[in-house]
Every structure is written in C-alpha cells, then in structure tokens.
Amino acid sequence: MGQKVHPNGIRLGIVKPWNSTWFANTQDFADNLDGDFKVRKFLNKELANASVSRITIERPAKSIRVTIHTARPGIVIGKKGEDVEKLRNAVSQIAGVPAQINIAEVKKPELDAKLVADSIASQLERRVMFRRAMKRAVQNAMRLGAKGIKVEVSGRLGGAEIARSEWYREGRVPLHTLRADIDYNTAEAHTTYGVIGVKVWIFKGEILGGMAAVIESEKEPAAQPKKAPRGKGRK
C-alpha cells in the first residue's frame, strides 16, 4: 500500500512556515523545545472552546512571543483583556522568561483544516450522522473559495461492529505538487463507541513566489486587546 508523507512537513521552507522560529545553542535547545511543547499543551487546554487554529512561538532576546491564531479572538482576549493577561502570566511562568501574547484572527474558519476537523469531530460527538457532517464541511469550504477539499473519517462509524474508513472529496487536492498550498490537520471525536479519527486536506491554490510570497502575506499586524474609544464622533 502506498503511504502518504505529511503534507505540512514536506512543504516546510517551500510554501509553509515553521510554527516555532528561534535559534538556540546545544545547551538550550532541549529546554526551548520542551518549553514550546508545554506552552502549546497549556494553551490548547485552556482555549479548547476558542477555535484555536495554530500557535506560533518566537523567542527574541531572552523572552517568548506567542501568537494565537483563532476564529474567536473575543473569547481569548476576554473582558478588557483580562483573560489574555492571565494567559500571559501563565506562559511566562511555564517558559521561565517574560512573555508577550498576540492574537491573530482567522478570517475564514471554513478554510482552516484544523477548525474544520474540530467542527466535524464535535458534530460526531453530538451524534450527527458522519456523512452529513462531512458533506456540510466540504460544501462550506468550496462555497468560500477552496480549490479542493478532502475529508476522511475512520473508526466505528455509526456504531458499526467493525471499524472502517470513509472519505469524501470535491475539487483538486494535488498532494504531489510542492508549490500547492495544502492545509492538512487532524482531530479526534471521543464517542460512546470509541475514538473516531478525522483528517482534512484543503487545497487553496498554488503559491508561485515561494516562501517570500508566504512571508509577505503574513505581515498583517496581529490584533491586540483594544481600549474603548473616548469620543463617539467618527472622522
């Protein structure tokens, strides 16, 4: 049987950026890697209901900068920025260095593989029929401009005695084309029958400029907790 390489891993440095960008010498590398793992584990647990897509980590000059990409920034920031301040203190304590937290909004959650996979998994846990959940996700993605999408679920589907896999695809998903912008992610649905795995591939088009084009597109400033405006008038 032909096996598939991880679509994100093979595209790192070609059209996909790294989730952790820092340099460390031999002594500090293991500590930094362990710190990144613990920070991500903590934030994913705390923000389980905040539709978090991915968490990027930078380490400039004995500090840590965490960017949380989420479809619901209001939940992460909290009332007057209280929640994000608690997260900042907790991350600083875990990493052992001063922390800064930025929030980046995911404008189209229907085109984000992680959020789509989480959505399908939560529907399966609520006993929605798996075919209906898959088709709904595919239709929403194609409606919002995806060039192609593939969804696969595997496990005891519908409470069947024998586990199996089913998939549904629409459009193109060219896994062999390295310049193709393919977003891939997974999720798990914990049902009464057992665990059902969900995999999502979303093809958004081809990136012709390589990493330079990717970096340019990601230069939009991350959202910060906003203060209430003083005046009511508009310019």
Curated annotation (Swiss-Prot):
Family: Belongs to the universal ribosomal protein uS3 family.
Domain annotation KH type-2: ranges: 39-107
Originating organism: Actinobacillus pleuropneumoniae serotype 5b (strain L20)
Subunit comment: Part of the 30S ribosomal subunit. Forms a tight complex with proteins S10 and S14.
Gene Ontology MF terms: mRNA binding; rRNA binding; structural constituent of ribosome
Gene coding for it: rpsC
Gene Ontology CC annotation, any one: cytosolic small ribosomal subunit
InterPro entries, A to Z: KH_dom (IPR004087), KH_dom-like_a/b (IPR015946), KH_dom_type_2 (IPR004044), KH_sf_prok-type (IPR009019), Ribosomal_S3_C_sf (IPR036419), Ribosomal_uS3_bac-typ (IPR005704), Ribosomal_uS3_C (IPR001351), Ribosomal_uS3_CS (IPR018280)
Matching SMART domains: KH
Its biological purpose: Binds the lower part of the 30S subunit head. Binds mRNA in the 70S ribosome, positioning it for translation.
The entry's keywords: Ribonucleoprotein, Ribosomal protein, RNA-binding, rRNA-binding
Protein name, UniProt field: Small ribosomal subunit protein uS3
Gene3D superfamilies: 3.30.300.20, Ribosomal protein S3, C-terminal domain (3.30.1140.32)
SUPFAM superfamilies membership: Prokaryotic type KH domain (KH-domain type II) (SSF54814), Ribosomal protein S3 C-terminal domain (SSF54821)
Superkingdom of source: Bacteria
GO biological process: translation
